[in-house]
């Protein structure tokens, strides 16, 4: 008996490997805690929030550090300017404090 297509005319398909190579499973659970935090964030926020993006970045960094993912620059993984966004949000929260200080210093300057 013969198995397969009639006449052996199966088309030859070539598979290309993924662009970044394989993505091995985390058998030892080295990055599971970060992955669970990320999945919970996505479940709760239901959007691509900055907080969830930072967890995704942390997860990929964990995989790189443990050898489960090839080392690469975060910019190549789609994390463009995230550090700036974080520092901008921090500086904008500090702006309220700075504005009160700058207005008091303006008053001192105006009084002199």
Curated annotation (Swiss-Prot):
The keyword Disulfide bond applies. One of its GO terms (cellular component) is mitochondrial intermembrane space. Disulfide bonds join 31-62, 41-52. InterPro entries: CHCH, COX19. A motif (Cx9C motif 2) lies at residues 52-62. Required for the assembly of mitochondrial cytochrome c oxidase. Residues 73-83 have a biased composition (Basic and acidic residues). The keyword Methyltransferase does not apply. Residues 1-16 form a transit peptide. A motif (Cx9C motif 1) lies at residues 31-41. One of its GO terms (biological process) is mitochondrial cytochrome c oxidase assembly. Residues 84-112 have a biased composition (Low complexity). It is found in: Cytoplasm; Mitochondrion intermembrane space. This is Cytochrome c oxidase assembly protein cox19, mitochondrial. Its main location: cytoplasm. Coiled coil: none annotated. Residues 28-70 form the CHCH domain. It holds the Pfam family CHCH. Residues 1-24, 73-112 are annotated as: Disordered. Keywords: Cytoplasm, Disulfide bond, Mitochondrion, Transit peptide. One of its GO terms (molecular function) is copper ion binding. Belongs to the COX19 family.
